[in-house]
Amino acid sequence: MEPTAGSEKESEGDTVTGECVNRIPVPRPPSIEEFTIVKPISRGAFGKVYLGQKGGKLYAVKVVKKADMINKNMTHQVQAERDALALSKSPFIVHLYYSLQSANNVYLVMEYLIGGDVKSLLHIYGYFDEEMAVKYISEVALALDYLHRHGIIHRDLKPDNMLISNEGHIKLTDFGLSKVTLNRDINMMDILTTPSMAKPRQDYSRTPGQVLSLISSLGFFTPVAEKNKDSANILSTHVSETSQLSQGLVCPMSVDHRDTTPYSSKLLNSCLETVAPNPGMPVKCLTSHLLQSRRRLATSSASSQSHTFVSSVESECHSSPRWEKDCQESDHALGYTVMSWNIIEKPSCTDSRDAIETKGFNKKDLELALSPIHNSSTIPETGRSCVNLAKKGFPGEVSWEARELDINNIHVATDTAQSGFHQSDQWAVDSGDATEEHLGKRGFKRNFELVDSSPCQNIIQHKKNCIEHKPRNAMSDGYINQRTGLTTEVQDLKLSVCGGQQSDCANKENMVNSFIDKPQTPEKSPVPMIAKNLLCELDEDCDKNNKRDLLSSSLLCSDDERASKSICMDSDSSFPGISVMESSLERQSLDPDKSIKESSFEESNIEDLLTVSPRWQENILPKGDENPAVQDSSQKMLAPSSKVLKTLTLSKRNAVAFRSFNSHINASNNSEPSKMSLTSLDGMDISCVYSGSYPMAITPNQKGTSYIPYQQTPNQVKSGTPYRTPKSVRRGAAPVDDGRILGTPDYLAPELLLGRAHGPAVDWWALGVCLFEFLTGIPPFNDETPQQVFQNILKRDIPWPEGEEKLSDNSQNAVEILLTIDNAKRAGMKELKRHHLFSDVDWENLQHQTMPFIPQPDDETDTSYFEARNNAQHLTISGFSL
């Protein structure tokens, strides 16, 4: 009996196992390896497009790297693009055949339109005649109307994303920034029964393999990632057992395996064998099996829901990408070795030290073995770039909570300082010397941390987790990439009020003050800074060598402003490990140069933006007074002064929430920071601890709850209602959905720049920009820099041609009604159909009309019609690799 043949070519491959046994081939999507890549076509902001061939038919294959989308937190946009194209069956929208993937890439296999994009055609023509522009705008308007009726907003409409078919018609493409209102995954019925195509033509029919590929999961998260959602609870149980040995909080010991030599491995093993039976040494973080238990796939680190969680690098004690051998995306460039030990401050620690020394190893040997820099005893000269290695701790004075636990936690981070920061450097050096002498007398084990700086630190410094104060006059160096025609992420948009420092949100939409997208230049700031720890509980390792996005746990402030500014809230069941920082931002201006993923907090005011800096961070405990009376363990608790109480009770400034590294959060290491709710600072019992000459640290407690020091790790605290949405009392512009502004500057609608809720009207605004560009050859709001473009958009500054170049009244009026600031009054499909400029358009038969330009390629693989845009924007496309 002959086997039944399948209806698809991609169904081949199954064979008959016996003479009398029939096997029906199961439809399956093809593999990307079945496609032959002919040549590159073009490159966009989030992927590259190649000309592919399979079975004698040509396809346009868009390749998107999963790692890039995870790092940019754009996985949901890849899903939205696939869904939007899969749901669309319109003659004016590019047809999607397959959605394929490999371990590293996502492949969207679409129809190849040989005519190139309209941007390239516009570069060749200079500008279009009115008749030609009207035909193109009419077809794009039909495409937008189709998308909007199906709940899809394009949000990146521009001539670059309009392709020309073989017959010269327009088809929209590049839905990478689109918004699909379908609040669920698409299924087979969505693909087969698109509402507008009750009886689809043969052109829109899809084979079973195509349908299966279009509804498949894109694999940004795997079953392993789902299991990791409960891994923190498992770790908490394990930590609970081991915490009985150390009677202290857990802090991870982070050692990069690639930097560990055989000698250092021997030292580590010796230390483990020596201190394991000793209950006075917290060795739980040195156990190797924890590394195995936390191993997970690299692709499991983010999903479409991951933006609601905080990075797991800080939130889970034993989770670090440096412990995972399978996460090797550029990690080889990092040459750091970081250690952080927490030793209980008890006389029994002396015995532990003696025990280690009896085996022939001491801490200095281990220190030298783990760091490639052996000359760590010499402190560099003040005012020069330096790396502080193995700084000594400050056991003389610790916070009240740490003293109750008999814990001495030291956290020293790498500090690359310039001459403007000699005060903080000198403070650290003096304290280290005094502490070394003090430790020699008391015989306690010292806490230490080794940080080896990497040559690539400047490259990855925008991925770090420090916060930099920068004066306003240092923010006007310009925008590095002066081209405004490419899709980009508008990372920083600061709206200012003309004529003074007012807080009236009604005036904040008048102009855009600055838009900066450049590398950090912390050396330019002349203000001396020092990093202050905002956490009451034990600090963890700052993880300086991680190239991924980290949450910040400290805020830089000048020496004269740090007093009475830090408020540390004790963790409760609802908000474990949250510290609150209240700072007067009227006295200084902050640089807004940061991305949403790199920020560790949610802005409470649109003017209160902070700058991410990888440089000036040094998390330290309050400096202890040299007076032995103050260092005595029976230190008195001083009552807060009236000035401090007034600051706490009368100040109504916005607060910024920071989450402790020890907080219990299930998260991925590439996720966006969560937006945490914050309890009111009013009505709290306040206790004050004074630590020598260092400024006060105010520790308010919740009313009605007595303070009990931690006897367990904060990871064991169950959070009651995390990630609650804040009450509707926010001043200023409403935040955008995901907090980011994505798109090309020239085509962004005002509501996007103002951070307001937006809808389909943003596409009609972009259509008005395209109409003006078709008629003149230049976008209406073009300027030299993006910030100037934004000012022109908000002012609606349109340079109308004059004289012989003057546009017709109908054309100018059509642009006017589309470029209306008020999105409620902006023209749409109905207004365009009634407009005099489109009076001669046959809207029902647009796809059958003769187009003014019909491509005439040399052969079917000709891509020359895309070259004009690529050359104008200096785009080069690299090779292809599976």
Swiss-Prot record:
The protein's Enzyme Commission number: 2.7.11.1
Protein kinase domain location: 35-838
GO CC, one annotated term: nucleus
Regions crossing the membrane: none
Modified residues (N-acetylmethionine): M1
Residue span of region Disordered: 713-736
Pfam families recorded: Pkinase
Keywords from the named record: Acetylation, ATP-binding, Cell cycle, Cell division, Cytoplasm, Cytoskeleton, Kinase, Mitosis, Nucleotide-binding, Nucleus, Phosphoprotein, Serine/threonine-protein kinase, Transferase
Location(s), subcellular: Cytoplasm, Cytoskeleton, Microtubule organizing center, Centrosome; Nucleus
Modification sites for Phosphoserine: S293, S371, S454, S554, S558, S633, S660, S671, S728, S878, S881
Residues involved in ATP binding: I41, S42, R43, G44, A45, F46, G47, K48, V49, K62
EC category name: transferase
GO BP of this protein: cell division; DNA damage response; female meiosis II; G2/M transition of mitotic cell cycle; intracellular signal transduction; mitotic cell cycle
InterPro entries (UniProt xref): AGC-kinase_C (IPR000961), Kinase-like_dom_sf (IPR011009), MASTL_STKc (IPR037638), Prot_kinase_dom (IPR000719), Ser/Thr_kinase_AS (IPR008271), Ser_Thr_kinase_AGC (IPR050236)
SUPFAM superfamilies attached to this UniProt entry: Protein kinase-like (PK-like)
PTM remark: Phosphorylation at Thr-744 by CDK1 during M phase activates its kinase activity. Maximum phosphorylation occurs in prometaphase.
Annotated catalysed reactions: L-seryl-[protein] + ATP = O-phospho-L-seryl-[protein] + ADP + H(+); L-threonyl-[protein] + ATP = O-phospho-L-threonyl-[protein] + ADP + H(+)
Record domain AGC-kinase C-terminal: where: 839-882
Modified positions (Phosphothreonine) in chain numbering: T207, T222, T521, T725, T744
Active site annotation, chain numbering: D156 (proton acceptor)
Source organism, top-level taxon: Eukaryota
Main location: cytoplasm
Gene Ontology MF terms: ATP binding; protein phosphatase 2A binding; protein serine kinase activity; protein serine/threonine kinase activity; transmembrane transporter binding
Record PANTHER family: SERINE/THREONINE-PROTEIN KINASE (PTHR24356), SERINE_THREONINE-PROTEIN KINASE GREATWALL (PTHR24356:SF1)
Family membership noted in the UniProt record: Belongs to the protein kinase superfamily. AGC Ser/Thr protein kinase family.
Protein name: Serine/threonine-protein kinase greatwall
Gene responsible for this protein: MASTL
